[in-house]
Amino acid sequence: MKKTLSVAISATLPVMAGYLILGFGFGIIMKANGFSTALAAAMSIFIYAGSMQYVAIGLMTGGASLVTTALTTLTVNIRHLFYGVSMLDKYKNAGSAKPYLIFALTDETYSLVCGELPHIPQEEKPRYQLLVSVLNHIYWITGSVVGAVAGGILQCNSKGIDIALTALFLTVFSDQWLTN
C-alpha cells in the first residue's frame, strides 16, 4: 500500500501543479462573478469537470435555459463516454470504488490510469487507480477553494485564466505520448 501510494503521488505531481493553478483560477473567476466560496467548493466536489465548470460560470451569469445547459454539458463532456467505455476492462476489479472511479475520470486522470502500469503489481492496480483519482480530485477541490477565498480577499483581473485548462491537458497528453 505504501509503495502504491508513493507511486500514485509521484505520478500525480504534474496534475497537482496544474489542478491547483486551474482550480485557483476557477475559484477567482467564481468570486469575480459574485458566486460564493461554498458554490465553488460544491461544484468542484460534485461536478468535478474543469472545462464544464468554467463554462458553467458563463451559463449561470448569462441566464442560460435548462435545455441550453444540458446540451452544452453533453457537448463539452461527450469525450467522457469514450473514456468510460475504454476503462470498463481496467475497472472490472474495482469493486465498490467503481462508481467513484467512473465519476472521477477526468482527462488527466485518464492519461495516468489508462496506460500500462508495469511498476504496480496486478493486485495493487485497483488501489493505484483509486489513489490517483482521489488525489487529483483533492487537488482540484483545494485549488478551487483557495482560489475562491483569495478571490474574495484580492481584487484582480481574471481575464485569460480559463486558457490554462487547455494548456494543462496538452502538457499531460504530450508527456504521456513521449513516455509511452
Q: Where do the PLM segments sit?
A:
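Helix-loop-helix hairpins and the membrane-proximal interhelical loops
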Residues: M1-I47, G58-V67, L71, Q155
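Hydrophobic alpha-helical segments embedded in the membrane of multi-pass proteins
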Residues: I21, T142-V145, G160-F173
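Membrane-embedded alpha-helical segments in integral membrane proteins
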Residues: L22-M30, Q53, W140-A148
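Alpha-helical transmembrane segments and their membrane-interface exit regions
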Residues: Y48-M52, T75-F82, A167-S174
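Transmembrane alpha-helix boundary and packing residues in multipass membrane permease domains
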Residues: F24-I28, I57, V85, A148, ...
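Membrane-helix interface "capping/anchor" motifs
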Residues: D175-N180
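Helix-loop-helix junctions within the multi-pass membrane cores of secondary transporters/permeases
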Residues: A70-D162
